[in-house]
Amino acid sequence: MAKSTVVEKVTEAVAPIVEEAKLELVDVEYVKEGGNWYLRIFIDKPGGIELDDCQGVSEKIDTLLDEIDPVPQAYFLEVSSPGIERPLKKPQDFEKFNGHLVNITTFAPINGSKNFIGKLLDYNEEGIHLEIKGKQVVLPHQQVATARLAVEI
């Protein structure tokens, strides 16, 4: 089974559990690292999540995944916060973090670069609008590989 199929099935299955706990389902990843498979579920809420949030949701998700068995091989389940460099995937993510520093990578170089760090100005049908060193840059949606919050030091 393709990784994307696993992610889609798990996302669909766990979303009601996360919503019932009044939390946001930020992302689901299914990755192989060092010979082991990991199913990572990232959750959040205003003000940030606590260990109890992760534990409560993890237990319910674990039980559900045992029942529906959407993953073809053994894996480790991890439920956690998305962290300070959280991914931005949905339009609502970009709206929520408008004005924040973001790090965006593209599939192919745009003006000679595939990595862009700048202030998020807007997200619309045109693309993702950033301010980088005082200049506005628009990255078309179809060119964006990943988008994350960036840490200002």
UniProtKB/Swiss-Prot annotation:
InterPro entries: Ribosome_maturation_RimP, RimP_C, RimP_C_sf, RimP_N, RimP_N_sf. It is found in: Cytoplasm. GO terms for cellular component: cytosol. Keywords: Cytoplasm, Ribosome biogenesis. Pfam families: DUF150_C, RimP_N. The keyword Membrane does not apply. One of its GO terms (biological process) is ribosomal small subunit assembly. HAMAP family: RimP. NCBIfam families: PRK00092.1-2 (NF000928). Belongs to the RimP family. Required for maturation of 30S ribosomal subunits. This is Ribosome maturation factor RimP. The gene is rimP.
